[in-house]
Design a protein with these regions (language model features):
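Flexible beta-alpha connector loops of hexameric P-loop NTPases
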Residues: 54-64, 120-121
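C-terminal boundary of histidine-terminating zinc-finger modules
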Residues: 188-199
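Short, hydrophobic alpha-helical segments
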Residues: 209-220
């Protein structure tokens, strides 16, 4: 899992027992040499976590964090050492900066799955990402795997998501219900899967993982 730290509680905290791990940009800014183990941590259920990080507020380009993280992962042999079954790049819905679209280029990612709610700004951002994927199609970059509806319980939410997907000749591959267990797990510095493994929310996440694996041609390997 490679994430962009733009909030106070990056995903690595929840996947690594509540411990904040150094971001790649923080390590780079120190100007000192560092090892793979300094930037990567193995968290819950064997998930390897890396936080790209962001610039000092008001300075620099946030997309640079993604580029730096990808460069350092390759340079330090992360993929060879950990040999992950799946690599997930969790990036912002902002494709104005080329850095944020980096994982879908140059062979880093095979499929792009776009998470949206039925809120207008979320749909707008999702459409922009889908357009970026379309623009990259002729270059052989990652293809659009589908949309994931992260429900906010707004009016006509399912219809809006379905219409968005249809506009890009795609589909909504999963609908995730809004759940208070997410914030409860966050307070515990855990993921829902770790804190509430038998919950409906956890079951929806498992079903989503199975669907993504199927769409990526991994279904027969489970």
């Amino acid at each position: 899992m490679t994430g962009v730290q733009t909030c106070a509680l990056p995903i690595s905290i929840f996947l690594h027992g509540g411990e904040r791990i150094p971001t790649v940009l923080d390590l780079v800014r120190k100007g000192e040499s560092f090892d793979l183990e300094d930037m990567a941590r193995v968290g819950y259920n064997g998930v390897v976590c890396v936080e790209a990080g962001g610039p000092v507020p008001g300075l620099g380009c946030a997309g640079r964090g993604i580029i730096a993280a990808l460069e350092e992962l390759e340079k330090k042999g992360a993929y060879e050492k950990y040999q992950p079954d799946v690599v997930i790049y969790d990036v912002l819905g902002d494709v104005v900066c080329g850095g944020f679209s980096m994982p879908m280029r140059k062979g880093y990612a095979d499929k792009v799955f776009i998470i949206t709610s039925g809120e207008s700004m979320s749909v707008y951002a999702a459409a922009n990402i889908a357009m970026a994927v379309e623009n990259f199609k002729s270059r052989g970059y990652a293809s659009l795997g589908g949309f994931i509806l992260n429900k906010r319980n707004v009016k006509n939410e399912e219809e809006k998501a379905a219409e968005l997907a249809a506009d890009f000749h795609s589909s909504v591959i999963a609908e995730i219900d809004r759940s208070d267990l997410v914030s409860e797990a966050e307070d515990m510095r855990k993921t829902v899967m770790e804190a509430f493994p038998d919950s409906t929310a956890a079951e929806q996440y498992r079903a989503l993982a199975d669907k993504i694996a199927e769409l990526c041609g991994m279904g027969e390997e489970k």
